[in-house]
């Protein structure tokens, strides 16, 4: 290791503290990928799918709820530290809050479809897959950390 804190391990330059600093970028990448896929499915694949496979139709129906269930908590998880101070309640509880806020918003959006005709169709499967997406985010978070 040199004086600047950089060491050479297995042919790769690394800084010991750099690993923790770059973890937030995983969450930005997760957010970007999920919302890119969301738009791809919602705007291109679903409207143009003419097949009769009921399983594919089912998954094309729930993916727009599943992907934001992963992406929104990921986004909130990295945004909360940018807004709140490190010793605040929001900073300390950012994992729970990011999941709670995302799930509340996404599930509320699904219930709004009951009262707004033409905005969508209420479906319990969408709520289930939103919760599964939130659970997958929690699993991904545990793997990252």
Where are these regions (language model features)?
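Short, Lys/Arg-enriched N-terminal segments with co-localized hydrophobic residues
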Residues: 3-5, 9-20
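Bulky hydrophobic segments
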Residues: 3, 20-145
């Amino acid at each position: 290791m040199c004086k600047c804190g950089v060491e050479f391990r297995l042919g790769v330059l690394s800084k010991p503290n750099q690993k923790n600093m770059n973890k937030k970028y995983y969450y930005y990448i997760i957010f970007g990928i999920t919302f890119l896929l969301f738009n791809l499915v919602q705007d291109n694949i679903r409207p143009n799918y003419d097949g009769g496979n009921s399983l594919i139709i089912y998954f094309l129906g729930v993916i727009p709820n599943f992907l934001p269930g992963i992406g929104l908590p990921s986004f909130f998880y990295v945004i909360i530290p940018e807004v709140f101070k490190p010793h605040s309640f929001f900073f300390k509880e950012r994992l729970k809050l990011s999941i709670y806020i995302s799930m509340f918003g996404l599930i509320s959006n699904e219930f709004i479809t009951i009262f707004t005709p033409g905005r969508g169709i209420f479906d319990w499967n969408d709520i289930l897959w939103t919760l599964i997406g939130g659970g997958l985010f929690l699993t991904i978070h545990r793997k990252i950390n």
